[in-house]
């Protein structure tokens, strides 16, 4: 069989352009990189990026640069149209980011592009739409600010395979943040911001007057910024200059963070990375890497920038000599900063595997019981003189006075809807936590409490017994089971509503979150918390606890936050309600939050009143779900009327309520079910946790008040000891990372102290 030669045909221009566009624009982050470089070439000082669905649905980038002339709008999206060079020889001295005229053209071939632009001498702005590089209609005059606004919609709408390959919006959004973050570090005199469409808070935000170190701190955190070394060298023979910041020997990460700019262009260089990491190998632990930000300025005639479609690679003369010079300079800087080294040690927790792989043998220290047949002698340094099961008298003396917001307010315990989350979490041996009473008992007990403290609400208390059968509607009727809880004699009242019949939740997302909590549980740490003896509070954030012969310092804030998160996940849609007797307007709460420095509001975010109205309308749309699943009740007028009751006799710190409302609208992922439940639970847990800034220390009180007869000087301490840490015993599954991030620290061990003091 003879082979027939194929016919060579000229490809259609549209096909050629679409193929070329697929090379230049590989993902949304590439498109944003190209447009940011155009903004920088236009002398912009403020660049704002807004994206939707990781940039696949919408990319909007706005600058305050020079703008585009109306006469140029006809050809601005055609290939090989640029204002930055005219002849090929101009490449030898090119100092701008763009030079081929392919960025906007490539984007217009794979997306719908709209450009709104205004020049300094223009009387108005002009808007034009483009498809396949061609102007769809004559530019229309419109209102607009100085600069250019480019809107890119439905990226890769005509390349189905590429769109299917980029199916993870979160991953694409992460790459966008990475690109913008790197350019913001290099261009410290320019303001950058990135946020999702509809969000009020930017995920990346830098200020025009911020330094390079400030931007590194904003993007990568304090852990990097406080360990930086400034580097800089120049070699006139090789015609290059280098400056930047590198991490010292105290800082290391699992993956190298390398920001390299050559002639202000973000590029990659495997050879330079390898040369620098060779230097760090002598200073950092094995399999760890440094943070590197380097900016090389090489004579333009020595650099070839036209070697890759995406421009992420460049070639330059004397490459080996320049790399060697940079390597030597960094080595000299590290050598001079190696006079001291900081190490973070982790004390071995009881029962953890030691270097030999064997678990540490627990020292029980309890005197030999009558059932012990061994008769082994217990030495003084092994003896535990406390019992985690013993109760204190003040546990029954609930404070009446209020110094902080997070303590229970009713003189008698208020029965809530706290039920066991799962058989794994429910520990039968916990005799101290208040168990949920039977419906009849709840009605009787509520009636007795009302007779003693709130006579005027006895009628409501008698209705606490549910009238619906187990098989009736799954909706909760909280109004018939209200129990008034007095904050103080003259203050506002709140209502704790019980929900005694448990709903069965079979949502896959919730079950998955429960499984994740169970899988990351640290059994040894759980055993310690279950059998600990509370020693005392250091401050609202830290507390001391003893387990066997060891003394631990525990981060109450982080542990309580994890506790409430797990309660929200395991008791999902089964909460009682803390109902405010006077509804709290969401608008007022949002305004209070925006007035707080914690919100991070600036004038660029828009008027506070408009943001507050948006928050109210947004949360009103989510009111049904919030009430059904989380017992956060919002009425039709936009008032907050109820909060979830997570633990009996515990009221969250209401000083944090405004920020909580703000973060509900801005920090929760409302697009995906699992992420929504997870982030909403975390925000709610953060609000309920013990937080130092919302606790009023007794040292700030006047001596006259603290010396008043019958006053309790430390009610928040009572709450921490008898409510929060009591809940840790039976309801907290501590995650493994608590043993590594400093939230649980071992301070002392009795046998080790005995070696020093030789007595106990």
Curated annotation (Swiss-Prot):
Acetylated. Deacetylated by HDAC6 which prevents the MutL alpha complex, formed by the MLH1-PMS2 heterodimer, from being recruited to the MutS alpha complex, formed by the MSH2-MSH6 heterodimer, leading to tolerance of DNA damage. GO terms for molecular function: ATP binding; ATP hydrolysis activity; ATP-dependent DNA damage sensor activity; chromatin binding; enzyme binding; guanine/thymine mispair binding; MutSalpha complex binding; single-stranded DNA binding. Residues 354-375, 400-488 are annotated as: Disordered. Its main location: nucleus. GO terms for biological process: DNA damage response; DNA repair; double-strand break repair via nonhomologous end joining; female meiosis chromosome segregation; homologous chromosome pairing at meiosis; homologous chromosome segregation; intrinsic apoptotic signaling pathway in response to DNA damage; isotype switching. The modification Phosphoserine is found at residue 481. One of its GO terms (cellular component) is condensed nuclear chromosome. Keywords: Acetylation, ATP-binding, Cell cycle, Chromosome, DNA damage, DNA repair, Nucleotide-binding, Nucleus, Phosphoprotein. CDD domains: HATPase_MutL-MLH-PMS-like, MutL_Trans_MLH1. Residues 417-428 have a biased composition (Basic and acidic residues). Residues 363-375, 434-446 have a biased composition (Low complexity). Pfam families: DNA_mis_repair, HATPase_c_3, Mlh1_C. Residues 412-654 are annotated as: Interaction with EXO1. ATP binds at residues 38, 63, 82-84, 100-104. It is found in: Nucleus; Chromosome. A motif (Nuclear localization signal) lies at residues 475-478. The modification N6-acetyllysine is found at residues 33, 241, 377. Residues 400-409, 455-472 have a biased composition (Polar residues). Heterodimerizes with Pms2 to form MutL alpha, a component of the post-replicative DNA mismatch repair system (MMR). DNA repair is initiated by MutS alpha (Msh2-Msh6) or MutS beta (MSH2-MSH3) binding to a dsDNA mismatch, then MutL alpha is recruited to the heteroduplex. Assembly of the MutL-MutS-heteroduplex ternary complex in presence of RFC and PCNA is sufficient to activate endonuclease activity of Pms2. It introduces single-strand breaks near the mismatch and thus generates new entry points for the exonuclease EXO1 to degrade the strand containing the mismatch. Belongs to the DNA mismatch repair MutL/HexB family. Component of the DNA mismatch repair (MMR) complex composed at least of MSH2, MSH3, MSH6, PMS1 and MLH1. Heterodimer of MLH1 and PMS2 (MutL alpha), MLH1 and PMS1 (MutL beta) or MLH1 and MLH3 (MutL gamma). Forms a ternary complex with MutS alpha (MSH2-MSH6) or MutS beta (MSH2-MSH3). Part of the BRCA1-associated genome surveillance complex (BASC), which contains BRCA1, MSH2, MSH6, MLH1, ATM, BLM, PMS2 and the RAD50-MRE11-NBS1 protein complex. This association could be a dynamic process changing throughout the cell cycle and within subnuclear domains. This is DNA mismatch repair protein Mlh1. It comes from Mus musculus (Mouse). The lineage of its organism: Eukaryota, Metazoa, Chordata, Craniata, Vertebrata.
